[in-house]
């Protein structure tokens, strides 16, 4: 189970004073074979909430659909968005209920309500909130970058550059991570905004990194 969970992805989420930034790369692998170079691993599940996926693609995509439906129903019934902690708790409970036949996934949930939040959630439903988190086979390299360069006082632009550097570090050392980088910024003012690919490419070049 652990081998399945840790293969083929690098995702990251960080909190700043007034924002959350989430990022993934796009490579999809099956053991040593690159199945897809443009896999989607970063999703908007509500106005102010994003989710990243690692693990079995089918399991992860089902959970994304479930969460989108649950959060939309909550918003229609109560006329407010579900708090981020409640989103993480709901997803955690869903996974824990099937822990003996688990969804083979590692997930990040990030968003902003009264404050920015990032939660990492494992296949058994374990949920941990932190100022930053990473999942997938490239996560050790991401944590190396974050531990030395992260600051809660960063601007959004600095935070975007940081997650790009972190994912790029994983791509250089982890053969199961690669391809283009996807980045989303979540703020109270604008909600969930995924940055255009050409903007990410421009930032990568400016930082002197390899596409």
Curated annotation (Swiss-Prot):
UniProt cross-references to PROSITE patterns, sorted A to Z: PROTEASOME_BETA_1, PROTEASOME_BETA_2
GO molecular function, a single term: threonine-type endopeptidase activity
Primary location group: cytoplasm
Protease as UniProt keyword: yes
Name the UniProt record assigns to this protein: Proteasome subunit beta
EC number of this enzyme: 3.4.25.1
Record function comment: Component of the proteasome core, a large protease complex with broad specificity involved in protein degradation. The T.acidophilum proteasome is able to cleave oligopeptides after Tyr, Leu, Phe, and to a lesser extent after Glu and Arg. Thus, displays chymotrypsin-like activity and low level of caspase-like and trypsin-like activities.
Quaternary structure (record): The 20S proteasome core is composed of 14 alpha and 14 beta subunits that assemble into four stacked heptameric rings, resulting in a barrel-shaped structure. The two inner rings, each composed of seven catalytic beta subunits, are sandwiched by two outer rings, each composed of seven alpha subunits. The catalytic chamber with the active sites is on the inside of the barrel. Has a gated structure, the ends of the cylinder being occluded by the N-termini of the alpha-subunits. Is capped at one or both ends by the proteasome regulatory ATPase, PAN.
Further remarks about this protein from its record: The configuration of the closed gate contains an opening large enough to allow rapid entry of tetrapeptides but able to impede the entry of proteins and longer peptides.
One Pfam entry name: Proteasome
């Amino acid at each position: 189970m652990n081998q399945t969970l840790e293969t083929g992805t690098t995702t990251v989420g960080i909190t700043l004073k007034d924002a959350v930034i989430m990022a993934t790369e796009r490579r999809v692998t099956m053991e040593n074979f690159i199945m897809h170079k443009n896999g989607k691993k970063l999703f908007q599940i509500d106005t102010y909430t994003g989710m990243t996926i690692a693990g079995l693609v089918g399991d992860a995509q089902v959970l994304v659909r479930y969460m989108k439906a649950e959060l939309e129903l909550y918003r229609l019934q109560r006329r407010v968005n579900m708090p981020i902690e409640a989103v993480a708790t709901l997803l955690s409970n869903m996974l824990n209920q099937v822990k003996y036949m688990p969804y083979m996934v590692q997930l990040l949930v990030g968003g902003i309500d009264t404050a920015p939040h990032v939660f990492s959630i494992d296949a058994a439903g374990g949920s941990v909130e932190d100022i930053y988190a990473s999942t997938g086979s490239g996560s050790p390299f991401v944590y190396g970058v974050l531990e030395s360069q992260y600051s809660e006082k960063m601007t959004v632009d600095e935070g975007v550059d940081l997650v790009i550097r972190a994912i790029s570090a994983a791509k250089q050392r982890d053969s199961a991570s690669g391809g283009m980088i996807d980045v989303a910024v979540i703020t109270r003012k604008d909600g969930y905004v995924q940055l255009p690919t050409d903007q990410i490419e421009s930032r990568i070049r400016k930082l002197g990194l390899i596409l």
